[in-house]
Amino acid sequence: MAFVAPVATVRATTKSSVCQVQGRSTFAQFSGMKKVNQSSRLQPAQSGSAFGGYSDANDAFYTRVSGIVAATFGPTMKVRVAINGFGRIGRNFIRCWAGRSDSNMEVVCINDTSGVKTASHLLKYDSILGTFDADVSAGEDTISVNGKTIKIVSNRNPLQLPWKEMNIDIVVEATGVFVDAPGAGKHIEAGAKKVLITAPGKGDGIGTFVVGVNEKDYSHDKYDIVSNASCTTNCMAPFMKVLDDEFGVVRGMMTTTHSYTGDQRLLDAGHRDLRRARSAALNIVPTTTGAAKAVALVVPSLKGKLNGIALRVPTPNVSVCDVVMQVNKKTFKEEVNGALLKASEGAMKGIIKYSDEPLVSCDHRGTDESTIIDSSLTMVMGDDMIKVVAWYDNEWGYSQRVVDLGEVMARQWK
């Protein structure tokens, strides 16, 4: 099913801004289990310089994200965004977006069947993130975040949502239900122009993008429905691209040790996957994942070369990806780590983080980057078999990339 997005009305102030990329700059912080920077991959340049004194590598990343180096934008468009589904990713999205003073998106509506009071409460108080350091309040059919009013609607049928009446540009589809073109396309039938799915897309008619890897391929005219892939694909794809470019990947196997998710059962109960039917709090649960194969959607040279499984474990957040691969080029541990360190400081700064400390999962909670290389665990067997271990905050880091992809879409708005 193909959809053609109508030309959107420009709704914005008439300011112009020179934009650049910066790895991790603090815009706002929330208080919780630890202080965390809320960062934007696309940020205003420092005064006095089009590039703000940052490296050529950062400028190169800017080129990939926006398609323009040191470009002065005309009327800055605030595209109108609605969120369908206000669960873990939906609420993380709001926190990430609220921390960006330069966002070209304006969240104006949330579809949540739990109601205004619950939506407001769960946004403010979070067992993983801690209390949101923002002014959050509930009205009759709205919530307010730092003075910005967001309408709350409640309808399980996307065709009946008020996207046309509210002039919605982008729907962030965060239910995990409408992940194919016919399902996500219902938002467009209801009046939205574009759909951004916060899960792997299924079937044809959906563009898959991983920021830092292939977001330069996004085209406003070509894609009406896009997917931000999965959190695990966002972890794997950046470092697999680096290793494939540097050493030439022949084949590989991945295991992700993944925190439990809302799709599992707290206590034993029915589920289509009999392993996921067992208590998430008590078991290591082996299950399937398409994350490894999906890497090929954004790194085509890896098509048919990767596969893997997931082990769901009794932790609420932060996961770790273990990839063993055969490569063409003979190498050694220090060379592998050197390539990953170089990427983390250069072209993939803000996407790959490099760690040489003996840390555990809780230490990575709230990390903005998509992947954290645990360099002490890198191994090379013989001279052509590599093992790389990478952590990722499967909620927060992923949600940062959803916001980033939304910004990529917004900056091409017509």
Curated annotation (Swiss-Prot):
Location of the active site: C231
Domain of life: Eukaryota
Transit peptide: 1-76
A Pfam family hit: Gp_dh_N
EC id: 1.2.1.13
Gene3D superfamilies found in the cross-reference section: Dihydrodipicolinate Reductase, domain 2, NAD(P)-binding Rossmann-like Domain
SUPFAM superfamilies, sorted: Glyceraldehyde-3-phosphate dehydrogenase-like, C-terminal domain, NAD(P)-binding Rossmann-fold domains
Residues binding D-glyceraldehyde 3-phosphate: S230, C231, T232, T261, R276, T289, G290, R312
Recorded metabolic or biological pathway in which this protein acts: Carbohydrate biosynthesis; Calvin cycle
Stored InterPro entries: GlycerAld/Erythrose_P_DH, GlycerAld_3-P_DH_AS, GlycerAld_3-P_DH_cat, GlycerAld_3-P_DH_NAD(P)-bd, Glyceraldehyde-3-P_DH_1, NAD(P)-bd_dom_sf
Location(s) in or outside the cell: Plastid, Chloroplast
Enzyme class: oxidoreductase
Residues that bind NADP(+): R88, I89, D112, R156, N394
GO terms under biological process: glucose metabolic process; reductive pentose-phosphate cycle
UniProt key word NADP: yes
CDD domains in alphabetical order: GAPDH_I_C, GAPDH_I_N
GO cellular component: chloroplast
Site (Activates thiol group during catalysis): H258
Reactions catalysed according to its record: D-glyceraldehyde 3-phosphate + phosphate + NADP(+) = (2R)-3-phospho-glyceroyl phosphate + NADPH + H(+)
Family recorded in the similarity comment: Belongs to the glyceraldehyde-3-phosphate dehydrogenase family.
Protein name: Glyceraldehyde-3-phosphate dehydrogenase, chloroplastic
Lineage: Eukaryota, Rhodophyta, Florideophyceae, Rhodymeniophycidae, Gigartinales
